[in-house]
Amino acid sequence: MELTATESPALARECAAEAVAAFERYNSEYRAITRRAPTRFEERDWQGSQRDAVERIELYSHYVERTVASLRFRLGRDALDRELWSAIKQEFVGLIEAMPDAEFRKTFFNSLTRTFFGTIGVSPEIEFVALDLDPLARVADYDFMATYANRGSLQLLFEEVLSGFRCKAPWRDFDRSVRYVAGEVERHCATLDEQRAATRVEMIRPVFYQLTRAYLVGRIVGRDWHLPLVIALKNTERGVLVDTVMTRDADISVLFSFTRSYFHVDLERVGKALLFLKQLMPHKPVSELFTVIGRAKQGKTERYRELFRHLQTAKDQFVPAPGERGLVMIVFTLPSFDVVFKLIRDRFPVQKNIVRADVLRKYELVFKHDRAGRLVDAQEFKLLRFPRRLFDAALLHELRTEAAGSVHEDGDDLIIDHCYIERRMTPLNIYLREVGPEEASLAVLDYGQAIRDLAYTNIFAGDLLLKNFGVTRNRRVIFYDYDELCLVSDCRFRELPAATSDEDEMRGETWYYVADNDVFPETFIKFLGFDEVLTPVFLKAHGELLTAEWWRGVQDRIRANDVIEVLPYGAHRVRVASSA
């Protein structure tokens, strides 16, 4: 039944109000989960922290699906009436325009309409155009900073800073932690030859929690200079202490990396805090900052906005990404923009014993799992519209012939039905060919550490070929090829059986039974392709990775529910306090 003229405005107002209320319920529950973090830290409940992280990630899609179902029931046959949805959008604007972080609500509205209509590209009459969604354009004033004046002593200054950390757990040795922070700051300032004294310290009041650590985030301010400041806190069985102090841009960047789990930080108004973080890390995209503080959907919206704003002036074309051709994914990039696009191929070679649904599940696993600073955050996008002229001819041919299930054409446009977007890195095999011996050795050492770090968080990369790892600007080795990724706990790590006869020894194929989940670590070294210089470097530091015993030991710890810490800092990057 068609709506009457008097019914339509009333229904539009009701639907807009329901959408606003749904977001408020989502946001309230999101913040309630986030506010568990201090208690998890105080009680050293690390398993609880991990559960909270997954629960919070799943919350957004849950509320979108529930709201769509409710609105579909309310609207009935008019659920796809675009004129009605245009009216709902206008009513929605009136309801949210005075609210803080209004752009978050617009993003939520877009999620609803895109679910209803399966929008390809942009439909301005029923959604908010991403290019116009700037969450930092109208940031409401918000008193979220604490300022501590330097009254002549760094020790007194940081005594006041640490006293501002409210925690039910006792300090293990408060005075020692104060001395450590003051000493580290003084030492770093000396390396900068900075003679002008720090006049104050500015700290974000809400604490940043990430699994087993709490972080106090702010900056040290002097006359005409400032330094970023992050103080990492650890809660041991004997109490809380300062674990490390970070004042270097590179170290702060690693902490707020696209490879780490999201922070739990309860910000009443997000935009103002994002502006401050952007000042601390001016080279980090706003999209990554939104994502790493846990606002993943807004981070995704920002990435879309950054991309399409860049395309308005870009002169280059999309081309295949550097590196070897993928067997499961087609990977391409825009050289002038620092991301790659990954599309699932229509067909996989016989040696890949997987189907498309398996690949989707692997990426979903990574999205919800502790990435340990070693897995790139892959954002899933659907129904992206690009002018076909932006694609290199060879790439366009490959997409048409090998990814027809993920792309289609509409007039002069190419529609990408499904893809993942990730930060671009230099493939490790290419990096090792391009750098000198010292840099290559450091990369090989970090490659081995990456395998360890992933194992500690119950992730086995599966395919350890160097081409499946990348190197970031901070020279961190990151894994980014997920089609063979699995849980360490699901594998059976075995020693190679000894040959029982000369005939077995001479066979070209495997003569013993191998189950799907069998892994033989002794064979890893054959596939890595290290030269005669780098092989001993790897074996000296990480030789135990080639033993089934080491992997079974990790499995035992996982089954015992041990939380093995993989921190965004360490002796090789920043000094860590004595915190045994």
Regions found by a protein language model. Give the residues of each.
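Catalytic activation segment of kinase domains across protein kinase-like and atypical kinase folds
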Residues: 341, 350, 460-515
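Protein kinase catalytic-loop region centered on the HRD/HxD motif
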Residues: 453-459
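Noncatalytic N-terminal accessory/assembly modules of large enzymes
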Residues: 2-251
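Active-site-adjacent segment of 2-oxoglutarate/Fe(II) JmjC oxygenases
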Residues: 364-381, 494-529
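Conserved ATP-binding subdomain of kinase catalytic cores across diverse folds
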Residues: 187-434, 439-442, 446, 456
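C-terminal region signature
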Residues: 506-575
